[in-house]
From Swiss-Prot:
Localization terms from the record: Secreted; Host cell membrane
Name under which the protein is recorded: Envelope glycoprotein C homolog
PROSITE patterns: IG_LIKE (PS50835)
TM regions (residue ranges): 466-492
Organism of provenance: Gallid herpesvirus 2 (strain RB-1b) (GaHV-2)
UniProt family annotation: Belongs to the herpesviridae glycoprotein C family.
Alphabetized SUPFAM superfamilies for the sequence: Immunoglobulin
Taxonomic placement: Viruses, Duplodnaviria, Heunggongvirae, Peploviricota, Herviviricetes
Segments for region (Disordered): 53-86
Amino acid sequence: MLTPRVLRALGWTGLFFLLLSPSNVLGASLSRDLETPPFLSFDPSNISINGAPLTEVPHAPSTESVSTNSESTNEHTITETTGKNAYIHNNASTDKQNANDTHKTPNILCDTEEVFVFLNETGRFVCTLKVDPPSDSEWSNFVLDLIFNPIEYHANEKNVEAARIAGLYGVPGSDYAYPRQSELISSIRRDPQGTFWTSPSPHGNKYFIWINKTTNTMGVEIRNVDYADNGYMQVIMRDHFNRPLIDKHIYIRVCQRPASVDVLAPPVLSGENYKASCIVRHFYPPGSVYVSWRQNGNIATPRKDRDGSFWWFESGRGATLVSTITLGNSGIDFPPKISCLVAWKQGDMISTTNATAIPTVYHHPRLSLAFKDGYAICTIECVPSEITVRWLVHDEAQPNTTYNTVVTGLCRTIDRHRNLLSRIPVWDNWTKTKYTCRLIGYPFDEDKFQDSEYYDATPSARGTPMVITVTAVLGLAVILGMGIIMTALCLYNSTRKNIRL
């Protein structure tokens, strides 16, 4: 939380020095003889005098030291002169005594330590300088550095929950988030003549900084916020030897509520477990979404051995989270109402939404394939009304004009299911042909329900029944011939006996 304080320190220091300088000029291009308003605003840019660029602040010599934590014994009254940017310090003591006065170390108070700002909007914070007015000889030069430290999130979530529980969420250096290279946004300086200087900004009008000399206030705006602005601002006040005096942190929390929440409950076959996935799309930051499950209104707890969650980040769109759960047995339980409850939380902001789905249960159909009277015949029992039949010959789909399918009745064991019969002429091509009867319309693999058989039309297969037929005919002829002969013999013998008598 150093960033908010640093920013505040910088703002207040600049304002304070403006008030103290006997001939304070707020802009490098403004004449001291011109009256200026108490409010100064500017974008970070190169402010120079006579075309000279901003000079570097000298480094502190090794023998120098800064006096701190001393209290002032004199009361100061600050009055702003009208018509000039100067301030008169009325002291109870003389100038000689004034030169020996000591003052408290300045402090910076910011209005917040965290700025929650939604995507594409503007984030703001204000800092105020708290310090006894020092003399110009003591505080003749200072620097306020505004530094941005980005925080980038890892593209995996193995430690998301652990980091959240441990309070490491958003902390640089944790397994969940880490800082990229820091960047100087602006360096604001006041010289002994009361002129304010600032370094150029590489971001154009991305940042807007203003100073109010009356209230000793500095404000910072971050415009059109995007994911790259997530991090913390660091406000550092340095003395004229470039030594840091105050360091404040203000965290910039980029926010984005989930764009959508959906529950996917895929269909299952009777006897399998119900499964569901909750998809939370396009939110920020990762870890700001909490998912809970309900089954028919009752709390359902995912199992660690087979359920879980994972997320990924899409550039320009935010994070997407998928949470999964496994429930019950579809062969025993009726299809449940599965609900996913999502809570998005950032700071004091909470947004909740939910989605519900009911899975569909399919029953295993019964089908068989046989050959009869020159047809391949497929008999199907207990299929939904949307199921149709497709024939394949040698694994090649056949036009539906080559076969026909009819409904033969209703299934006796499953409501709203029916029985079908489909047939296709077999090929009389003197070869062995594969016929496949496949059910189409199930939300599973296409070959999930099918039956295949071979029809043998080779000469060898055809020869066997012919031999049997010829043999049968010859056998019958022999039997008939023998019967005729025996009958004739019997009649002949009977006739001879009658003649003898």
